[in-house]
Amino acid sequence: MRGGAEHEERAYVYMVRCAGGQLYTGWTNDPGARLHAHKTGKGAKATRAMGAQRFAYLERCADRSDALRREAALKKLPKPKKEALCAEWEGKNLPRLSVATRADAADILEIYNWYVLNHTATFQVTPSTLEEYEDWVDNTRKVAPLLLARDAEGKLLGYACAHRWHPREAYDWSVESTIYCAPDARGLGVGTLLYRALLEVLDVCGYWNVYALVADPNPASEHIHQRLGFSCVGRTPHTAYKWGWLGLSTWWLALRSGSEKPAPVRLTSPEETAAILKKYGSI
């Protein structure tokens, strides 16, 4: 999983649910970074005092001026109308987890190519083709199930998967995680939901180590990895050049420990995968 700076200008209006049930309204260019700021006490005074938890509402706007106008309108709404908006939004955006097939390649590619063109979360600079990604889906599913999160209307909110850490046989028990969320789904908890489900799948498969490569610096991504139990095991500056020099940090999570010879890894059965996904979202 990588994270980094965004190249495309975007604007959103949002409401954040706080610990006591209160709603805080604001606007932002980067939902994920803004929610992280609110949750870590670096956002508004109100959310520092009330304890921000999650987005209860998020709406993309045409530009900053439109977001400011929409923010002012939302702030004037009485609490019952705000709650009604949040309930409708949450009903539409509640993630439904499933396993990807080759037929999902186009939806996955749409998300990934957005990051290629607009973000340093990936160091790729040339968009991939559908043919490449259909093959990519097939190859990825040989390592572990490729997990999807969709909303109630079927829109892809994000995906999570694993790849071999190294092609040599002795590395068979180590994988690299990959997670991307749709631009409008960042900061909604979709990534964490997918990540937790993926880690449980990888554990059942018999993998020992999960690695993640993160564009450096990226406090929000690092916070997620720390919360999930990863440790940073290395940082290298000036690793890649995409709209400027970028560093890279390597994160590691041990799924099991010991010195005995490991059992061969295997794919989870459809029943095992379904049971795991049921814990994190409907399938």
What are these regions (language model features)?
Residues 109, 113-136:
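Conserved GNAT-fold acetyl-CoA-binding loop/helix
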Residues 17, 127-184, 195-196, 255-256:
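Acetyl-CoA-dependent GNAT
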Residues 192, 216-234, 245:
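Conserved active-site alpha-helix within GNAT-family acetyltransferase domains
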Residues 161-164, 211-214, 231-247:
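Conserved catalytic-core motifs of GNAT/GCN5-like acyltransferases
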Residues 96-108:
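A short beta-loop-alpha structural element at the N-terminal edge
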Residues 238-283:
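C-terminal "cap" of GNAT-fold acetyltransferases
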Residues 202-214, 224:
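Conserved GNAT acetyl-CoA-binding A-motif
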Residues 1-94:
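GIY-YIG nuclease catalytic motif and its immediate N-terminal context
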